[in-house]
From Swiss-Prot:
Residues of the TLDc domain: 37-198
Family named by the database record: Belongs to the OXR1 family.
A Pfam family of this chain: TLD
Biased composition (Acidic residues): 1-18
Record's protein name: TLD domain-containing protein 2
Organism encoding this protein: Mus musculus (Mouse)
Region entry Disordered, spans: 1-30
PROSITE patterns (alphabetical): TLDC
Amino acid sequence: MEDTLSGEEGEEEEEEEPAPAPAPQDPVEPQLTEASQVLGASEIKQLSLHLPPRVTGHPWSLVFCTSRDGFSLRRLYRQMEGHSGPVLLLLRDQDGQMFGAFSSSAIRLSKGFYGTGETFLFSFSPQLKVFKWTGHNSFFVKGDLDSLMMGSGSGQFGLWLDGDLYHGGSYPCATFNNEVLARREQFCIKELEAWVLS
């Protein structure tokens, strides 16, 4: 009889006190593998609210940064090899302006444009402004050896970076109907980070 009672008690305990589940990660608080040199915690939290639900809760892994890896687009492509997940590009220019882009897939060399409508541009000027896909065209991301381009239309790019990742530009484009992301259409990069979100 004791066996039966203890068995019943054990069953009751399981129903009343299941093993505690790990506390869910706050989807607004991304887990970064290391500190960003471009954005602070407040900006990261604001930006994370605009990321697609499929990447919410995924850790942010710093795959490339100019302070560690140097100013080289080819090096950025090499660091991206083997990664397929979405990428967040964070930039700070010589004027201190912070801006960047979310790419739905890894940054890579390509003959044409690639990506999906999840891709967007953003700027902190000083408040966060996010420029999502308009549906007018599908010119999301294109990478060649001399430049990386995001968004296009009428011969202008929403964001472009040159091969040495030192100079860049931003112009209004049909893909995102964006404003100029930096204070000026042409800028010099002080720091660039590429975070894989997967």
